[in-house]
């Protein structure tokens, strides 16, 4: 079947996004965490999800490693595979946001163009780009998975920040200092969600 087969049409459903959001008691949005490996994306996203859950907010966290165990298990780390990885995640996260959830995504997502495509897919008003800015030297010191060590030794090729480029966001909605305490970063994000009337508490 062709990618845009004329026989495939969009089917609207009687339950709207607004109705789902009303049921949840908050807006459905996508929080896109981006940054180098070891920057703290997953840690901050996980801590924020826990804080939201404690406040009765419906959430789901999509993590870069986890999706490669299932949804993206057939993909490698070439530029083409990385692009497809982000496209798939963007589609899934968009559906979850439509369901009225606050979706947190923690992906290196090194290219601006890919992040822009996700933003366009979910809608500018429901996409919040969160740049976890941590110096490469600090990320290498942390190196929780030992990947930087392997990359420096030549055992791991095409690793972002070493021999593959990371394009930092030009104007992210949120710019976090990844060297700050996680609790401080979570507080900043909760304040943002309240100011934007995404959550109430």
Swiss-Prot record:
Record keywords: ATP-binding, Kinase, Nucleotide-binding, Phosphoprotein, Transferase
Pathway where this protein functions: Sulfur metabolism; hydrogen sulfide biosynthesis; sulfite from sulfate: step 2/3
Reactions mediated catalytically: adenosine 5'-phosphosulfate + ATP = 3'-phosphoadenylyl sulfate + ADP + H(+)
One Pfam family it belongs to: APS_kinase
Residues annotated as the enzyme's active site: 109 (phosphoserine intermediate)
Enzyme Commission number(s) from the entry: 2.7.1.25
One annotated GO molecular function: adenylylsulfate kinase activity
Binding locations of ATP: 35-42
Signal peptide annotation: none
GO biological process, one term: hydrogen sulfide biosynthetic process
Family annotation (SUPFAM superfamilies): P-loop containing nucleoside triphosphate hydrolases (SSF52540)
Keyword Kinase: yes
InterPro entries the UniProt entry points to: APS_kinase, P-loop_NTPase
Biological function: Catalyzes the synthesis of activated sulfate.
Family statement: Belongs to the APS kinase family.
NCBIfam families the record matches: apsK, PRK03846.1
Name of this chain's protein: Adenylyl-sulfate kinase
Source organism: Salmonella paratyphi A (strain AKU_12601)
Gene that produces this protein: cysC
């Amino acid at each position: 079947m062709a990618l845009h087969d004329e026989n495939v049409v969009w089917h609207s459903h009687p339950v709207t996004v607004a109705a789902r959001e009303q049921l949840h008691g908050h807006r459905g949005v996508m929080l896109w965490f981006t940054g180098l490996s070891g920057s703290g994306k997953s840690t901050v996203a996980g801590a924020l999800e826990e804080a939201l859950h404690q406040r009765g907010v419906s959430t789901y966290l999509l993590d870069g490693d986890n999706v490669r165990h299932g949804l993206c298990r057939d993909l490698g780390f070439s530029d083409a595979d990385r692009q497809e990885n982000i496209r798939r995640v963007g589609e899934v996260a968009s559906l979850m946001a439509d369901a009225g959830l606050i979706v947190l995504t923690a992906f290196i997502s090194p290219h601006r163009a890919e992040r822009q495509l996700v933003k366009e897919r979910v809608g500018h008003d429901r996409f919040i780009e969160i740049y976890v800015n941590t110096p490469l030297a600090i990320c290498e010191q942390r190196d929780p998975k030992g990947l930087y060590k392997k990359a420096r030794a030549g055992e791991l090729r095409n690793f972002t920040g070493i021999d593959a480029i990371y394009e930092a966001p030009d104007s992210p909605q949120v710019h976090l200092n990844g060297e700050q305490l996680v609790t401080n970063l979570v507080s900043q994000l909760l304040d943002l969600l309240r100011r934007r009337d995404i959550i109430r508490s």
